[in-house]
Amino acid sequence: MTLADRLIRYDDLNPCTNAFIDTRSPGSDKKENFTLIGPGVAENPDQHIHISIPHGFNIGGARQPAGCLNSQHSHLTEEFFVIHSGTWAFMSGVNGDDGKVIINEGDIISIPTDIFRGFENVVEGSAYLYAVL
């Protein structure tokens, strides 16, 4: 395997618009999900995995237009997010009302296990973030 086989160019990302059940919910239906390295936590078995070689971790991504909400959810693994572009609101709690932070390009947020979290692009235009599990 060469380095080129392990390269994912941003312009070549292959999105999935139905990776999770929440993509059928109003407000979440415009989200694009990306499974970059490893199978991730997508609920759609047909989602394209850019690099499927086992790594011991997963990296995914989400691209959302302004006002698009990723519904509250939790994981059995810790998850952290790296903001690639835009400004994002992260909300915690089952209903999203336990806490809220606004983060920008280059910022990183770590979410512990079993914490309900959701996030929303709060700027005009499309924004992108990476998720590491």
List PLM regions with ranges:
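Glycine- and acidic-residue-biased ligand/ion/polar-headgroup-sensing regions
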Residues: P65-A66, L76-A89, G93-V94
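Short histidine-centered beta-strand/loop micro-motifs
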Residues: Q47-S52, L69-H75, S92, K100-I102, ...
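A short hydrophobic beta-strand segment most commonly corresponding to one strand
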Residues: F80-V82, D107-S110, G118, E124-L133
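Conserved short histidine dyad/triad with adjacent acidic residue
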Residues: P39-Q47, N58-H75
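A short, N-terminal "cap"/entry segment at the start of jelly-roll beta-barrel domains
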Residues: M1-G56
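Short acidic-glycine-tyrosine-enriched beta hairpin
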Residues: E78, V94-T113
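Histidine-centered metal-chelating micro-motifs
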Residues: C68-S71, A89, I108-I109, T113-G118
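Short connector loops at helix/strand junctions that flank enzyme active sites
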Residues: P54-F57, H75, I83-S85, N104
